[in-house]
Amino acid sequence: MIQMQSHLRVADNSGARRVMCIKVLGGAGRRYASVGDIIVVSIKEAIPTGRVKKGDVRKAVVVRVAKDINRADGSTIRFDSNAAVLINNNGEPIGTRVFGPVPRELRAKNQVKIANMAPEVL
């Protein structure tokens, strides 16, 4: 569960390393975001040669959450940390690679391009 002021790692090669959620998109008063949801983030830490700079405000898709994700078959999955992938205003990833595993719930939330770039889909 990601909410405002939550810090996330960045799981792509866009140049950002850490981001902070400043808004959860998808309805007035929506408080939490989970895997596949789009959030607005502020970049808190970035590498000097990246496509984004510290202080930029961008959109991102949540790809990993530390909170349990319940599946229809009764199983659950959880990750060690919260992570996101930066996207542009058209919904396309800024980076060209995604690091680490992503859950298959991304495909159900129309984030197929990110799921295809990931090395492993759980």
Curated annotation (Swiss-Prot):
Could you list this entry's UniProt keywords, alphabetically sorted. Ribonucleoprotein, Ribosomal protein, RNA-binding, rRNA-binding
Q: What are the GO cellular component annotations?
A: cytosolic large ribosomal subunit
Q: Where are the transmembrane segments?
A: none
Hydrolase keyword on record: no
Q: Which residue positions does the secretion signal occupy?
A: none
User: Which one Pfam family would you cite for this protein?
Assistant: Ribosomal_L14
| Any one GO molecular-function label of the UniProt entry | structural constituent of ribosome
GO terms (BP aspect) = translation
Give the InterPro entries listed for this entry: Ribosomal_uL14 (IPR000218), Ribosomal_uL14_bac-type (IPR005745), Ribosomal_uL14_CS (IPR019972), Ribosomal_uL14_sf (IPR036853)
Protein family according to the UniProt entry: Belongs to the universal ribosomal protein uL14 family.
What is the role of this chain? Binds to 23S rRNA. Forms part of two intersubunit bridges in the 70S ribosome.
Q: How does it assemble?
A: Part of the 50S ribosomal subunit. Forms a cluster with proteins L3 and L19. In the 70S ribosome, L14 and L19 interact and together make contacts with the 16S rRNA in bridges B5 and B8.
The molecule here is called Large ribosomal subunit protein uL14
Supply the source organism for this entry.
Hyphomonas neptunium (strain ATCC 15444)
Q: What is the lineage of its organism?
A: Bacteria, Pseudomonadati, Pseudomonadota, Alphaproteobacteria, Hyphomonadales
Gene encoding it?
Answer: rplN
